[in-house]
Design a protein with these regions (language model features):
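Short helix-loop boundary/capping segments at the starts of domains
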Residues: 36-39, 51-58, 188, 207
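Short inter-helical turns and helix N-cap capping residues of alpha-solenoid HEAT/ARM repeat scaffolds
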Residues: 38, 78-79, 107-111, 140
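Amphipathic alpha-helical packing elements
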Residues: 2-31, 36
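Amphipathic alpha-helical scaffolding segments comprising HEAT/armadillo-like alpha-solenoid repeats
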Residues: 24-32, 55-74, 93-107, 124-136
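Residue-level detector of alpha-helical secondary structure
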Residues: 8, 29-32, 44, 181, ...
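Residue-level signal for cytosolic alpha-helical hairpin/rod architecture
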Residues: 6, 27, 83-84, 99
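Structural detector for internal amphipathic alpha-helices that build alpha-solenoid repeat scaffolds
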Residues: 15-20, 42-59, 73, 80-95, ...
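Fe-S-dependent hydro-lyases/dehydratases of central metabolism
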Residues: 115-235
């Protein structure tokens, strides 16, 4: 799996795009390797776990959350992931499959503080909100902290302030902007692959869509596009 993924990374780099995240099969193989890591691959395996598995309710996220929950509860072990680290990483998964294990861990005397900090910054908890509220009403101190943090919107107030000024490069597009500009039909096959599909944006030169510096426009990291009208379709 590691050799194949490294080859994939190289192929994507040649296209100027980041590698795809791991799918559920690759993540399952990663979990197996994390439990018994090959010598010299430890840092790479940890990086894949932390940064290359999608968050939320993707099936790969399910595999990751299940593994981390098992480590946190002592049901699985890895020399590369401690119980505390497993709980912390659950807290980076935004919402979805990570929420139930974090709520359960509010009852763990050792790990409850870490689980609470994770939940304070997690908004997509859905029905699990009531589980946290019930624990708080039953006297669970960690759950009380989470409820108070949500009430105080610390998930928002703890974030960096919006910069007073933002410098951008303006690319003015005259006329109506539509799918042919932002998501050309001939590139529809790549739409699920957002970084790759982004290379097709504004590729079709037309009157009003002709960059002054076409070879440089893709190098700009932050651009403000001004247009007369954006057509209300698949864009």
């Amino acid at each position: 799996m590691l050799e194949a993924y490294r080859q994939h990374v190289a192929e994507r780099a040649a296209l100027g795009v980041p590698p795809k995240p791991l799918d559920d099969k690759q993540t399952a193989e990663l979990v197996t390797l994390l439990k018994n890591p090959p010598a010299g691959e430890e840092a790479f395996l940890v990086d894949l776990l932390e940064n290359r598995v999608p968050a939320g309710v993707d099936q790969a996220a399910y595999v990751k959350a299940a593994f981390l929950a098992a480590v946190a509860k002592g049901e699985a072990t890895s020399p590369l992931v401690t119980k505390a680290r497993a709980v912390y990483l659950l807290g980076t998964m935004l919402g979805g499959y990570n929420v139930a294990p974090l709520v359960d861990l509010l009852d763990d005397a050792e790990l409850a503080p870490i689980a609470a900090e994770a939940l304070k910054k997690t908004l997509l908890v859905f029905e699990s909100f009531h589980d946290v509220a019930e624990k708080a009403q039953s006297g669970n101190g960690a759950a009380k902290e989470v409820m108070q943090s949500w009430a105080d919107a610390e998930w928002f107030t703890s974030r960096p302030e919006v910069p007073a000024e933002i410098t951008v490069t303006v690319f003015k597009v005259t006329g109506e902007t539509n799918t042919d500009d932002l998501s050309p039909a001939q590139d529809a096959w790549s739409r699920p692959d957002i970084p790759l599909h982004a290379n097709a944006m504004l590729k079709n030169v037309r009157d009003g869509n002709n960059p002054d510096k076409p070879t440089e426009i893709r190098q700009i990291k932050q651009i403000e596009a001004l247009t007369d009208k954006v057509h209300t379709d698949s864009n």
